[in-house]
Amino acid sequence: MKIILIDNYDSFTFNLYHYLSSYCKVEVVRNDKIDSSEILKKKYNKIVISPGPGNPNQAGNCLKIVKKLYKKIPILGVCLGHQIIGQVFGSKIIQAKTLVHGKTSKIFSKKIGILKNLPKTFDATRYHSLIIDKKTLSKNLSITAETKNGVIMGIQHKNYNVHGVQFHPESIKTKYGLKILKNFIIEK
């Protein structure tokens, strides 16, 4: 198994790398140093899109990569990566009513997809000012997790192996973060 971890110039990327590399080979590449044809050529089995500053339009080649490869290679987006997936499928990314940087929140899971074997509620660390607008959520995406206030914390594509989490599974304060990443790795 070989994963490409697309780095959106974020300090959390290597926490993700550390967790993922305990299960498989991981190559970290910056978001503007790779494109979909190179990903196909290198025969990666899965794609993980890291957190990062800014919004999806500022994430190098990530939007194009998801658009071109979501039917071919499983994808997991974390924080900014989650927002990229939402935007690719037509959801709007908006400013959150409350900015959440370095705070832990209760996450309410629907226990499906990469969250299937977790408790219905768990604590997770959040660092974000943008969110997927629930009112414009794509019909192609399902909500897999939310906060108590209904902020989308997890999504998955209805027909393809594409997942996003707004929270940070790589944070030490996210109780089941390693399990979530493992679920993505082992999911067919």
What kind of feature is each model-predicted range?
Residues M1-I4:
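Extreme N-terminal starter segment of soluble prokaryotic enzymes
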Residues T13:
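Active-site-adjacent helical/loop segments in soluble small-molecule enzymes
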Residues Y17-K25:
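Two-component/phosphorelay signaling modules centered on CheY-like receiver
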Residues V26-N31:
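Short hydrophobic/Thr-rich beta-strand motif most characteristic of the beta2 strand and flanking loop
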Residues I34-Y44, T136:
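Short amphipathic alpha-helix with an adjacent loop that forms part of the alpha/beta core around
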Residues K41-N117, T121-D123, L181-K182:
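Cysteine-nucleophile active-site neighborhood
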Residues G113-Y160:
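Catalytic beta-strand/loop cores that center a nucleophilic Ser/Cys/Thr
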Residues P169-K188:
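Acyltransferase
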